[in-house]
Amino acid sequence: MKINRQQYAESYGPTVGDQVRLADTDLWIEVEKDTTYGDEAVNFGGGKVLREGMGENGTYTRTENVLDLLLTNALILDYTGIYKADIGVKDGYIVGIGKGGNPDIMDGVTPNMIVGTATEVIAAEGKIVTAGGIDTHVHFINPDQVDVALANGITTLFGGGTGPAEGSKATTVTPGPWNIEKMLKSTEGLPINVGILGKGHGSSIAPIMEQIDAGAAGLKIHEDWGATPASIDRSLTVADEADVQVAIHSDTLNEAGFLEDTLRAINGRVIHSFHVEGAGGGHAPDIMAMAGHPNVLPSSTNPTRPFTVNTIDEHLDMLMVCHHLKQNIPEDVAFADSRIRPETIAAEDILHDLGIISMMSTDALAMGRAGEMVLRTWQTADKMKKQRGPLAEEKNGSDNFRAKRYVSKYTINPAIAQGIAHEVGSIEEGKFADLVLWEPKFFGVKADRVIKGGIIAYAQIGDPSASIPTPQPVMGRRMYGTVGDLIHDTNITFMSKSSIQQGVPAKLGLKRRIGTVKNCRNIGKKDMKWNDVTTDIDINPETYEVKVDGEVLTCEPVKELPMAQRYFLF
């Protein structure tokens, strides 16, 4: 029997050659391959295939390659490709991507993807599925940030802080063993993966190393604590020994040295450069030149993404609050003004589109918005398509190349940068099942369901007193994956190898899954998926004009964006 493409898409989701629009943007993705097509496409419901003796095998037990969870007919958007597949989950990890079902009566069922009595099903046909987002720049100021992050499809937070202390409001740092231990205990109750950054400042190695041994997953150097060449060198020395990443917010005022001095202190070692454009902080006015170096892993924070008519105006007040500055002190105002440059913010848009800036993050509650990392990534992509047109690599009128470039900025690339790509960051076999389902019309704006470790943790769902799940008010709510002891199974605390070897999780009584940070020091820009371009970036110190290979990079701020007021009442 044959049905037309429209009927097929309505029943099983789009297939090869079909295109799907992302939210209300001008971006379209095309299905590159379909692993579920043919035989009887697996779906669930009354009169459907996934019944005992049909798509479900009722004879196999869970120990016989039967899945715990099957996502059917998902349109996967990942650095690995844009394709249709079933996703099989067992013990909280992805064990198969292909075709699920009953191999006794169905052709082409992927090994390890047997649907049996033990299997739960999520109908993903008509949905886009991405890996959970990874935000590497979070100020741990308010635990309510977690719900906001989950709503935008973010499942991992790396950062520092102890609450609304002045040090935490300004710097992503949890300072010293005592504070690190307390935050490790506190984050036990959060339904999100966590890695804590220690303070990368000390006159000797010992005060830095003791933080790594206490459970820090990396180090942060920040100008508000003194981003001196000596601090940079010592932190990188510790990082090389402990195999953790160092993130840097360099010296805006150029007091301890200029960009060249910072690069000299880094000395070719790998480092993660936060808000590399500079509005969030860093050597004024040329910090963005770091983005072109092969050992620098550059990221943006979301308040400058993308460049709009409001971007400049909102930054000054944000900066004064976050860095404990006073409006009546001229030097404080001058410090703030030096960081806000329309020319470099405009160029930042284009550097993302060229694959020179590799990652996105939020700077949550400290000049950034915890729930807008994914949203602003795709707003930037849409703005660039409208202003620069399709990329040369695109085919068939789709935006697949650009889509893979931009989705990598908040999934696989931050995972690689922070040494956690063996656990999270992509939809691949062996990865922890942190998955986000999106309705295409709400893509990047409001996640339909967020799966943590194979269990639904957050979902758009209706009135809990209703007779069915859909009556209004439909809103994002925490689900069973966040309740009781299950929260320990569905979330990972990432820690340094040395702290795990020294028994810190047991000493602190941690119950969550523990993930080891590793492979941070043998990487570089070349490892940033779809965003590995190195080049010379020249910034004029007087006009702030940005050039790459002699070409001036600039674009106009926009007055309107997609994925904005159409989706939000407030």
Curated annotation (Swiss-Prot):
Carboxylation allows a single lysine to coordinate two nickel ions. GO terms for molecular function: nickel cation binding; urease activity. The modification N6-carboxylysine is found at residue 220. The keyword Iron-sulfur does not apply. The keyword Lipid metabolism does not apply. Belongs to the metallo-dependent hydrolases superfamily. Urease alpha subunit family. This is Urease subunit alpha. It comes from Sporosarcina pasteurii.
